[in-house]
Regions:
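Single conserved hydrophobic/aromatic residue that forms the stacking wall/gate
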Residues: 1-11, 200
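Short, glycine-/Ser/Thr-/acidic-enriched flexible segments
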Residues: 9, 16, 22-26, 37, ...
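Structured core elements
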Residues: 9, 16-20, 66-68, 80, ...
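Polar, glycine-rich mid-to-C-terminal structural blocks
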Residues: 13-20, 27-30, 43-47, 54, ...
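Long, C-terminal catalytic modules of enzymes
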Residues: 42-43, 50-83, 166-198
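Primarily the HKD phosphodiesterase
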Residues: 80-143
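Short beta-strand or tight-loop elements
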Residues: 140, 151-155
Length: 200
């Protein structure tokens, strides 16, 4: 969600962005556990504004911070995985933790297998369907966990170790073909230290 309000001076406005792993649904709000980020960081707010302009056909898709499905999400995910593979190859301990509702996309599953074969330590927290096969020779460094709790785990949070300087993302897409290639869904990095420590 994007909002903008005046600051008393007709020429001054403050814009805000809210990016969540779920939506505002009164029926599921009492059952689902989600995360949301409410921010006025310009790089995130500007990207979200550009996304809405793109959906209206008024802007070319240019995103510097957000990862947006059908635009820059897949290339950036591949870059993040490649980084962890490179670190593992150098003996610096590649690390990936992914929390999501479903893992089904064959291309991304193959990337996780590849990372595992290079020694990247991977933890998957998948609530629903998981097409990745753990405990095989090609997935020996991958652990799959499911959380059973009072509320339905709905958050999508991705952690990439980045040699001790973690890159953490949250957003709406699961790793399914419909989410990664057909829908337009947004993922934001967690840039401030307090939310980083909370999600970590």
């Amino acid at each position: 969600y994007y909002a903008s309000r005046g600051l008393g001076d007709v020429y001054k406005r403050q814009s805000y962005a809210y990016i969540s792993t779920g939506n505002f649904n009164e029926k599921t709000a009492t059952l689902y556990a989600d995360c949301g980020l409410f921010t006025c960081r310009k790089e995130i707010v500007n990207d979200l504004y550009n996304l809405f302009r793109t959906l209206q056909g008024k802007e070319d898709p240019k995103f510097t911070t957000l990862l947006v499905a059908r635009f820059n999400l897949i290339p950036e995910l591949n870059r993040l995985i490649d980084r962890e593979i490179s670190l593992a190859d150098q003996g610096k301990g590649g690390r990936i933790i992914l929390k999501m509702n479903a893992l089904q996309d064959p291309a991304m599953i193959d990337r996780l297998y590849e990372a595992s074969e290079h020694g990247v330590q991977i933890d998957l927290i998948v609530r629903g369907i998981c097409c990745l096969i753990p405990e095989q020779s090609y997935s020996r460094n991958i652990r799959v966990t499911r959380i059973v709790d009072s509320f339905l785990e709905h958050a999508r949070i991705w952690y990439f170790g980045n040699e001790g300087h973690p890159k953490i993302y949250m957003g709406s897409p699961d790793w399914m073909r419909r989410n990664l290639y057909r829908r337009i869904e947004a993922v934001t990095p967690i840039l401030d230290p307090d939310p980083v420590s909370y999600t970590h």
